[in-house]
Amino acid sequence: MSKIIFMGTPDFSAPILKALHEAHGVSLVITQPDKPVGRKRVLTPPPVKVMAESLGIEVYQPESMKSDEAFERVHALSPDLIVTAAFGQILPERVLDIPRLGCINVHASLLPKYRGGAPIHKAIINGEKYSGVTIMYMVKRLDAGDMIDSVQVPIEINDTVGTLHDKLSVAGTDLLLEVMPSVLSGTNNRTPQNDSEATFASNVSREEEYVTFDRTALEVHNHIRGLSPWPVAFANFDGKAMKLWASEIAEGSGAPGEIIQADKAGLVIATNDGAVRITSLQPAGKKRMDAASFVAGAKSQLVGMKFNEA
């Protein structure tokens, strides 16, 4: 049996690890260190570590794959193949050169589009009709290696990062299992990427989380769902940041950012060509709530108030 190292960290990667281990056996899992989570800063293991331990696989959590210790750990195992999926660290060339069959990555986009760390977010924000998963060889440049295979996944109008993430994780799992026999036998396809068609999906910045309403309703809706359920979009309301968790396209007109309707269905906010309805939100210092609860508890008239008012 081939020796396989799996590298991954978040929820996206855990089912991929499980399926890979059950089909081919994984000798070692490498994942990010445990991190403090929440207000109480509780040290929490990444989902891939939890999955690996439930499967009885040895886990290694280096601070950096660039360290001599990490190199030696991988080198000592003499793996035939490294499989990565949303690992969160760039592998140095000397690690990429270790496995006899190379290193392959399960990437959540249709490469060469959306290379980088936030392909799911950026595909939704940009209003793409399709996303997908590509399995490719890893090279020194980020997400630029030869492609083995890909699968297309439709993006529905109300998909969020969360729902699309789950669809792509399933698609990535299925595609990996499909290509593994040919990868292990060295008979798989290798298609070079066209660098002239490459686009990049860098991690979402704080500035990109800020929603403006002087755009089309569809652009605003895409922005909100493209950041939900993490890191969550926000806009300024009554002098404070309000997180906007969920939205839908609505009818109506008014000045961009103006609340034109507030009832049990939510807050309807005007855009430059129509409106969006906010159905779930989080006022500053409070927990997430449905917009109907916010409307019911409002101490002042909401209709006519504006988001992002200077």
Curated annotation (Swiss-Prot):
UniProt keywords, alphabetically: Protein biosynthesis, Transferase
Catalytic activity: L-methionyl-tRNA(fMet) + (6R)-10-formyltetrahydrofolate = N-formyl-L-methionyl-tRNA(fMet) + (6S)-5,6,7,8-tetrahydrofolate + H(+)
Enzyme Commission code(s) on record: 2.1.2.9
Binding site for (6S)-5,6,7,8-tetrahydrofolate: S109, L110, L111, P112
GO CC entries: cytosol
InterPro entries given in the database record: Fmt, Formyl_trans_C, Formyl_trans_C_sf, Formyl_transf_N, Formyl_transf_N_sf, Formyl_transferase-like_C_sf, GART_AS, Met-tRNA-FMT_C
SUPFAM superfamilies recorded: FMT C-terminal domain-like (SSF50486), Formyltransferase (SSF53328)
Disulphides: none
Pfam families, alphabetized: Formyl_trans_C, Formyl_trans_N
Function: Attaches a formyl group to the free amino group of methionyl-tRNA(fMet). The formyl group appears to play a dual role in the initiator identity of N-formylmethionyl-tRNA by promoting its recognition by IF2 and preventing the misappropriation of this tRNA by the elongation apparatus.
Name the record gives this protein: Methionyl-tRNA formyltransferase
Organism this protein belongs to: Macrococcus caseolyticus (strain JCSC5402)
